[in-house]
Amino acid sequence: MSNQSFRLVLGIAAIGFASISAHDAFGAPPTVPFGVEFKGCVESIGVALAPTENVVALTPPGFIPVGIGTPTSPIVVRTADCAGISVDGGKSKPGSVVQIGAVIVPPAFSGEDIDNYTFWYYTSDERLAHRLRKAGVSAQHVETIDYVLEPGMSGVPNHLAVVVPRPGDPRFAVAGTVASSVAPSGAFRAAWWQKTAAGNVRMDTTVPVIAIGAADLTLATRPDNALGALIGATTLGFPILQQFNVFVGAHMDVFVAP
C-alpha cells in the first residue's frame, strides 16, 4: 500500500505502578516537553470498531470520536518493539510500547496523519513510563511485555504474538500473522493525546521513512476488564485497517498542547 493510500484509508476512518521519586535513579528533569528516539522498530497497527457509547464514555469533553452520531467508532490498537528507545538523550535500550485509543477529531490540528485519544499506554521502558507519568499521562510500566515475532522473509507471513501481562491493566493479547515489506512508503506522523491536570498532553511521533506490510491479527481479552467492556466482547478483529510496519527510526515529542 502506498503512503498516499495509507493516508486515504486513515482519512476515511478519520482515523503504552509504583511511583518513582523525582530524585531517584532518573534524576529530576523538567516534566515537559521532552523527546524520545526509537530505533530499529517493528510495529503492528489495527483499527477496529467499538460501540460509540462505550468509546464516548472513555473520551473526555473536547475530544470528538470520529464515529459520533453512529453506532460504532474506530479504535486503534498499536504494538511496537524497538532495538533502542532513548528518552531525552539517555542511554538507548531495547523496549516495547503498546497503545489503545480512539480515533478522534482533535482540539487542534497541526498536519498529522492521524489523531488518537489514549485510553491505555504500556511500555517495558521504565524511564519512558516514568517521564510520561511525570507529564500526567497514565502510562504503565510493564517490564515483561511479551513481543514474539517469528523470523521470516520479507513478504512471507510469519507469526506475531504480543501479550500485556500483569501489572498491565487491562491485560490482553494480540496475535496472528504478519508480512513485512521492504518498500518505503514515505513519512508518517501520528498524535496521541491525553487530558491531564496540566492540560492536553500530546505525544507526536514522526517516522521519516516507513515500510508498510500486511497483517491478520486478533485481540483477546477478558470480559470483566475495562477493555472487554469497551469492545463488548472477548475478542476483536480489525476490519478497518491492519498493518505490520518496519522503520529504522522515529522521534516522539511530548508536550502540553497550547
Predicted regions: what is each one?
Residues 19-27, 102:
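Signals and flexible motifs at protein termini associated with secretion
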Residues 82-167:
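Aromatic- and glycine-enriched beta-alpha-beta binding-site module
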Residues 9-21:
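Bacterial N-terminal signal peptides
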Residues 1-10:
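Bacterial N-terminal signal peptides that target proteins for export
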Residues 135-258:
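Interaction-surface and assembly-scaffold signal
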Residues 3, 17-19, 122:
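Intrinsically disordered, low-complexity segments
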Residues 26-86, 217-236, 240-243, 251-258:
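N-terminal domain-onset segments
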